[in-house]
Curated annotation (Swiss-Prot):
Essential protein. Component of the coat protein complex II (COPII), that covers ER-derived vesicles involved in transport from the endoplasmic reticulum to the Golgi apparatus. COPII is composed of at least five proteins: the SEC23/24 complex, the SEC13/31 complex, and the protein SAR1. Acts in the cytoplasm to promote the transport of secretory, plasma membrane, and vacuolar proteins from the endoplasmic reticulum to the Golgi complex. Involved in maintaining the dynamic identity of organelles of the early secretory pathway. (Microbial infection) Contributes to viral systemic infection of turnip mosaic virus (TuMV) by triggering the formation of host endoplasmic reticulum (ER)-derived viral vesicles that carry the viral RNA (vRNA) to plasmodesmata for cell-to-cell viral movement. This is Protein transport protein SEC24 A. The keyword Nucleotidyltransferase does not apply. Residues 371-396 are annotated as: Zinc finger-like. The gene is SEC24A.
């Protein structure tokens, strides 16, 4: 097929571009180093701190007064705060509360120690005393100004290990085998999990490779960066009632946490352009403690970067192209200090909101305007010179002629007079109609070919009936009418071909039993035009479930059937949809029952379980890609099916894997119907290739996702749609970049379903900087996490799971250590974990990646098929969907359901995300867990019976595993169903199944919800607190 570069077998080497001035460091006026090229006439502006990164000199002038001897150290907890987790509990009194549920088995109480007397001092403590603390609601910790250290007080042994969680629930036992959906959307066996909320001191298993240590809590604030004074924080403390005057609170004056302590006097004039977690020591303990409630959490979801929206308004939207940092390093040495991924995530066909559609451009007889040297498409960043007769390429600086039909005069500023009528010169994203020279054959029609397993498991589970009904219901909505073509092959131990010629009234079935030498009968009548043979196709789909309802064949000749489908499709290409119910057992591609062998895990051969066993599958994928055949795999078996091998077909053809373990039409039917219908009816780009170009001195060195790499930088995508994203890493080819900006252009050449050959073009620009701090400030957590997840999954295919998880942790440690070194000279960092505002969620997302299904635990935590299916899915997800899967939504809905319903439901009140921790759950509440692939309704044990009865009907008191969630005839149930519908419609690419679970129903509660509370410790993996402590310890190591 054609490529973008007609007449040019490979792109030429990118020539030298005009020199540009290097970007100055933030806060220093840029020095002129020559005129820049491109439409941007100014160089990179110094970074202006946003509201989230305020900077302001300290208000105090001069050194602070020397504190009197005998006062407390800054790290000591205030005697007023005696109920902070990990500190000494108060002696028993009338105000003591029972420990929370999910506590230690047997209900062992906390070990209690006497409180020390308040040290003698003439100065009052800073800040008013907190109110009494209720169980589960901790008061913010407090600290004092820096004072002379006092002799440590012997505190005795630390408190006994405890766990905490929800009222009234016990630690759930390990499960055996339950076929519930795993994340994402896969059903998973219940692992042995011992819940323990990390906010409470306890003996916790550490991250693999690190010793288990006692983690205690201390009053340590989440240190915010300084900034201009804002509204004073609302305090929950009562007025101070002591008999002495209260000192002014410096932290309140600067809108900081009350625990804030000023740096030494010699740096009073400096600002802290970073965030930090302040880690202090508990007296009598060698471990630091943390206030887990102040940890950063992405409760607002993914926030797309817009730091350069004003400077570069013509950049394409970040939904199409997201760089890991919007500041490109100017040298290899600077790039080597950036330990985070340097690259981008591209989603070329991302869905656009109404009113923001990509403009369609037809250059007509003029031909597409491209650079003669680097083949860049004309875009908003090219410049016109010589009175409009020449234009300069923004990527290679080549001076090109302007065709006569495209000529326009320039105004006094050098701007074309017809600029407003040229979307390609004002929009960062455009779609261009390609002329015939971009085709090596006529555009292919949309082709849908179905390869369906009809063995006994397919018929008994109801899969065959659901698939046939769904295909028939979508025939009128298949893209490309009236050019669309369709065909079918079914198989068990033999192959069944179907002649659907339009002249027939009923389809003719032809059976081929020779699996070694495949013979395709009537090849011209197996793939037919849908509009011409619609009657025959309808008759076939109506009769398909009945044809095999009494089939007891258990064999699967999948390999021969795949070869037969390839032989039918290789003339035109198209989309091949495979429905597989069992392990391939006959003919080519026959697979063994590998399963999960516990003896292999932890050895050098462990990764072999997660890659294709037979090279047949990768070779077939390569052949299909060559002939423009994209493959989507639907797998259904509750037994081992070897998704690692089957998924290879989707991986290298730009497709995706759908996994329904233990499929039963009564349970999973709706999910299959919606996802298959979405696959069939969404707009698809056929026979596509994608290339991303960038300026001189840099190149994209590696690509990650579902595709076949045709050359060093050309991605072959037989079928691509809006639900596919691709990640890539960037490297510097030159020691020093001389340009002031770097340009990126993504070009997707494809055939639209209507038969037009089109080119989707996205162009963006980023400044080149000399300051590592600026790279951190302009970092995009979403893009970094997307690359990290793909790299970790790929590493798990060549190394142990422990190695893949440790690699994530080490990358984050190196990045935080390098960032700490930037500020270690100017600021006394002490025991603070320092990080930029832009990366405040990176540690939590890193933890979530290590707990995701592809990397989770070992063989007892998830099945091999579930692990591999999740990996194939995550490799193709766009940024927003991946972040939601890693840190799902948790909402409380019972209070909202009790409110009177308005004419139009306002979901803002209910869609307030909660931290993913057991502490967020109240036994009196009703919660919804949503990761984009499933919905879990968690009914607290003490939830009002009226609410449960309204939502569940007469079965409200029964075992919820046997209750079907459906709408009841009352307003509360209808209101909840509207909310569920809204959550499903927010992302139509997958259809989340809805599961009901009641508090204490084990092991379902542990599997469906508790094990997915990322911030809690589970099954040997770290909780959020322990993870932060591990990062901090390693960052401080030399």
């Amino acid at each position: 097929m054609g490529t973008e570069n007609q007449g040019y077998p490979n792109f030429p080497a990118r020539p030298a571009s005009s020199p540009f001035a290097s970007a100055p460091p933030p806060g220093i006026p840029p020095q002129s180093g020559g005129p820049p090229t491109g439409s941007e006439a100014v160089g990179f502006r110094p970074f202006t701190p946003s509201a989230s990164q305020p900077t302001r000199p300290f208000t105090a002038s001069g050194p602070p007064p020397a504190p009197p001897v005998g006062t407390m150290r800054p790290g000591q907890p205030s005697p007023f705060v005696s109920q902070i987790p990990g500190s000494r509990p108060p002696p028993p009194s009338s105000n003591s509360f029972p420990s929370p549920a999910y506590g230690p088995p047997g209900g062992a109480p906390f070990q209690r120690f006497p409180s020390p007397p308040f040290p003698t001092t003439q100065n009052p403590p800073q800040g008013p005393p907190p109110p009494q603390t209720l169980a589960g609601h901790l008061s913010p910790p407090m600290s004092l100004r820096p004072q002379q250290p006092m002799a440590p007080v012997a505190m005795g042994p630390p408190p006994q290990s405890t766990t905490s969680g929800l009222p009234g629930a016990n630690a759930y036992p390990p499960a055996t085998d339950y076929h519930m959906p795993a994340r994402p959307g896969f059903q998973q066996s219940m692992p042995p999990v011992t819940p323990s909320y990390p906010g409470v001191g306890g003996s916790q298993p550490s991250f693999p490779g690190y010793p288990s240590k006692q983690v205690l809590q201390a009053p340590t604030p989440f240190q915010t960066s300084q900034g201009p004074p804002g509204p004073p924080p609302v305090s929950s403390y009562p007025p101070h009632t002591g008999g002495f005057a209260q000192r002014p609170n410096m932290a309140a004056q600067q809108n900081l946490h009350p625990n804030y302590a000023p740096p030494p006097s010699n740096v009073q004039g400096l600002t802290e352009d970073f965030n930090s977690l302040s880690l202090s020591s508990i007296p009598g303990s060698l471990e630091p403690g943390l206030d887990h409630k102040s940890f950063p959490r992405p409760l607002d979801g993914d926030v797309e970067p817009n730091s350069f929206a004003e400077m570069y308004p013509m950049n394409c939207h970040s939904r199409y192209l997201r760089l890991t940092t919007s500041a490109i390093p100017n040298s290899q040495s600077l790039a080597s200090r950036w330990h985070l991924p340097l690259g981008a995530v591209v989603c070329p066909l991302a869905e656009t909101p109404e009113g923001e559609e990509v403009p369609l451009i037809d250059f007509g007889s003029t031909g597409i305007i491209r650079c003669r040297r680097c083949r860049t498409y004309v875009n908003p960043f090219v410049t016109f010179t010589d009175s409009g007769r020449k234009w300069r390429c923004n990527i290679c600086s080549m001076l090109n002629d302007v065709p006569g039909e495209y000529f326009s005069h320039l105004d006094a500023t050098g701007r074309r007079m017809d600029m407003d009528q040229r979307p390609e010169l004002t929009k960062g994203s455009v779609e261009i109609i390609a002329p015939t020279e971009y085709m090596v054959r006529p555009p292919m029609p949309p082709i849908y070919f179905f390869l369906i397993d009809v063995s006994i498991s397919a018929t008994k589970s109801g899969m065959l009936e659901v698939v046939a009904q769904t295909i028939k219901s979508c025939l009128d909505n298949l893209p490309g009418y009236p050019r669309t073509q369709i065909g079918f092959i079914t198989y068990d131990s033999t192959l069944h071909f179907y002649n659907m010629k339009s002249s027939l009234s009923q389809p003719q079935m032809m059976v081929v039993s020779d699996l070694d030498d495949i013979f395709v009968p009537l090849p011209d009548d197996l793939l037919v035009n849908l509009s011409e043979s619609r009657t025959v196709v309808d008759a076939f789909l109506d009769s398909l479930p009945l044809m095999f309802q009494d089939n007891f064949n258990v064999e699967s000749a999948f390999g021969p059937a795949l070869r037969a489908a390839f032989m039918v499709m290789n003339q035109l290409g198209g989309k091949l949809l495979i429905f597989q119910n069992s392990l391939p057992s006959l003919g080519a591609g026959r697979l063994k029952l590998r399963g999960d062998d516990p003896r292999v895990y932890g050895t050098d051969k462990e990764y072999a379980l997660r890659v294709a066993e037979d090279p047949f599958y990768k070779q077939m994928a390569a052949d299909c890609t060559k002939f423009q055949i994209g493959i989507n795999v639907y797998a259904f078996s509750d037994k081992y099916t070897d998704i690692a091998s089957l998924g290879t077909l989707a991986k290298y053809t730009g497709g995706q894997v759908y996994y329904y373990p233990g499929f039963q039409s009564s349970v999973h039917g709706d999910k299959l119907r919606h996802e298959l219908a979405r696959d069939l009816t969404r707009e698809t780009a056929w026979e596509a290739v994608m290339r991303i170009r960038c300026g001189k001195g840099i190149r994209f060195s590696s690509y990650h996702g579902n595709f076949m790499l045709r050359s060093t930088d050309l991605l072959a995508l037989p079928a691509v749609d809006c639900d596919k994203a691709y990640a890539m890493q960037l490297s510097l080819e030159e020691t020093l970049l001389t340009s002031q900006t770097v340009y990126f252009q993504v070009a997707l050449l494809y055939t639209a379903s209507c038969g037009e050959r089109r080119i989707r073009v996205h162009t963006s620009v980023a400044p080149v900087v000399t300051d590592l701090g600026e790279m951190y400030r302009q970092a995009d957590t979403g893009s970094i996490v997307s690359l990290y997840a793909r790299l970790a999954i790929e590493k798990s295919l060549s190394a142990k799971l422990d190695d893949a998880r440790n690699a994530i942790q080490q990358k984050i440690v190196k990045a935080l250590k390098e960032y700490r070194n930037l500020h270690a000279v100017q600021h006394r960092l002490g025991s603070r974990l320092v990080y930029p505002e832009s990366l405040k969620f990176l540690p939590l997302y890193g933890l979530a990646i290590t707990k995701s299904t592809p990397l989770l635990g070992g063989p007892a935590d998830t099945s091999l098929d579930e692990r591999c299916a999740a990996g194939f899915t995550m490799m193709a997800l766009p940024v927003k969907k991946l972040l939601k899967l890693l840190y799902p939504n948790l909402f409380r809905v019972d209070e909202w359901l009790l409110k009177p319903s308005a004419a139009h439901d306002d979901f803002k009140d209910v869609l307030r995300r909660l931290p993913l921790a057991a502490e967020s759950l109240d036994s009196r509440g009703l919660y919804i867990y949503d990761d984009g692939f499933r919905l879990v309704l968690w009914f607290g044990r003490m939830l009002s019976p009226d609410i449960a009865k309204n939502l569940l009907g007469v079965d409200f008191a029964a075992d919820l595993s046997r209750v079907t969630f459906q709408e009841q005839e009352n307003g509360m149930s209808k209101k909840l169903m509207r909310l569920v519908k809204k959550l499903r419609e927010s992302d139509p690419s997958y259809h989340p199944m809805c599961f009901l679970v009641r508090q204490g129903e084990q092991p379902r509660e542990g599997f469906l919800l508790l094990r997915n509370l990322i911030e809690d410790q589970m099954g040997g993996s770290s909780g959020y607190v322990d993870w932060i402590l591990q990062l901090h310890r390693q960052v401080q190591q030399n």
